[in-house]
UniProtKB/Swiss-Prot annotation:
Protein's recorded name: Sex-regulated protein janus-B
Family membership: Belongs to the janus family.
Residue numbers binding substrate: R42, S110, R111, T112
Record organism: Drosophila melanogaster (Fruit fly)
Encoding gene, per UniProt annotation: janB
Alphabetical keyword list: Differentiation, Sexual differentiation
General function of this protein: JanA and janB regulate somatic sex differentiation.
The keyword Iron appears for this protein: no
Length: 140
């Protein structure tokens, strides 16, 4: 009898793992966490998730040398929509990427999307292999 009670719990145990390893969620792993260009960038901190699975999201950083943050958002949508990935903007700012000096400065806010959590952005950049040796400063 105990075995039957244990078997009833099996769907509750397996379901979270099934969601984590479904093909829709695996596509999130294929999205690079950081894409910024050299020089001064406008950047956005973005929470991405597969439609219907908002609980299993991932935070990414995207930046480009463009006139406004809306242009960065448009490029994000062009990248993610074909994959069926939704994006929620957490905020924006500016990044000065001095690759030759191995320095990055994160500062400012976006007029369109509000300010991003620059400390969180710094942590994401430091976790990325390209920028782990960089000196990253945050100015609010």
């Amino acid at each position: 009898m105990k075995m039957f009670k244990s078997l009833r719990l099996l769907p509750h145990i397996v379901s979270p793992f099934q969601k984590c390893y479904s093909t829709d969620l695996i596509s999130l792993v294929g999205v690079p966490r950081v894409k910024i260009t050299k020089g001064q960038n406008r950047y956005l901190l973005v929470n991405i998730h597969t439609h219907g699975f908002t609980k299993y999201g991932r935070v990414i950083v995207r930046g480009a040398d463009v006139d406004n943050h809306l242009a960065v958002f448009d490029s994000i949508l062009e990248e993610l929509e074909p994959e069926g990935i939704c994006a929620k903007i957490l905020g924006g700012g500016r990044i000065l990427n001095e690759a030759e000096n191995k320095k990055i400065k994160i500062y400012g806010t976006s007029r369109t999307f509000g300010g991003a959590d620059h400390t969180r952005t710094r942590n994401i950049l430091q976790a990325w292999t390209t920028y782990k040796d960089f000196k990253i400063t945050v100015k609010q």
